[in-house]
């Protein structure tokens, strides 16, 4: 079922029945599996008695993206191309700005459909395309379980204020998505370049070692099936323990839209009691979408609540026992073996354990001479090395370390009333030296 709340017509145009096909402009939901936008596009093509093509604009100037991110993305595109062909749908990838690619193929289209992202640049792309098209552009939201405006009509203060609002909608939106059958395939059309020609020799602005994760829906489905069989119970008990191997590792795939959060939630619910997994997947993740969608300053320290900004500035002159430069932090050259291990995990694998990411961000605040500079450093490192950086979860995760979505705590030096974390807590809760040893082993491989 595709709920009406997921669907928005962006420009009020009517279909052009002279068009040769319907075009789905894929950007945020890079999958053929459980994709509301794709299924809506198939419905549209069938109703207009047209074939369907899918187009993707491969731009080399997405903010802060490097070869690590592009490699994962292209692996996912290769996977979705194969899956779309099995459904009679041709994927066209062109190396140009995403709106330009859509506008090119819209010239011979009857109607256009797209998915939904929440970052400013994604909104700008959609606005640019909608204003230039002579055919309808319909946006279908598929990367959240509850559509953002349905969950809340304002930026929420915390998970505590957001949770009751989203929970009241879950029963209605937690329903399977039926796969449609396309009546007219597009495999014989030749609208654009061959896929491998489009991605061959693609050069990202910055070269970085690939992550240990391979992109694509097929890989995501395999990893998640293993998680349900072997790790779900462990996750419910030990999700915060960086020593345990309990995580689903779905965040990179959710970031690129290569897996559906609705599919994950329904499969996990079928597998057993999993309130902690659903809390992170639905409440925490979709709170980050709420944050980015409604905040005008999600990528800067000014996004913080007034109390957090004020208390950090009240303590800006507090002496730091340790201060580190960006270069020292990036190279994991601090006095703290636990922080160094977390940074190295991110650099080597492309992903950091969630609990360690909280500790990591808190220490950057503690070891930098100004909170605004600390904020920028944390975002820079997160966006550069994390496969799942540069997205709502990443922005919200960094902001949380500085007081976003949290309450005021007892006042102390440097942090003021922002929540504090220290290595004693790591030692008390976990066998944290085993975590350090494991990351050291990765460095030796």
From Swiss-Prot:
E.C. number: 4.1.99.3
Molecular function as annotated in GO: deoxyribodipyrimidine photo-lyase activity; DNA binding
Photolyase/cryptochrome alpha/beta domain mapped to chain residues: 20-148
UniProt remark on cofactor binding: Binds 1 FAD per subunit.
Binding annotation for DNA: 239
Pfam families recorded: DNA_photolyase
Entry keyword annotation includes DNA damage: yes
Enzyme class: lyase
SUPFAM superfamilies: Cryptochrome/photolyase FAD-binding domain (SSF48173), Cryptochrome/photolyase, N-terminal domain (SSF52425)
Keywords per UniProt: Chromophore, DNA damage, DNA repair, DNA-binding, FAD, Flavoprotein, Lyase
Task performed by this protein: Involved in repair of UV radiation-induced DNA damage. Catalyzes the light-dependent monomerization (300-600 nm) of cyclobutyl pyrimidine dimers (in cis-syn configuration), which are formed between adjacent bases on the same DNA strand upon exposure to ultraviolet radiation.
Family to which this protein belongs: Belongs to the DNA photolyase class-2 family.
Protein's recorded name: Deoxyribodipyrimidine photo-lyase
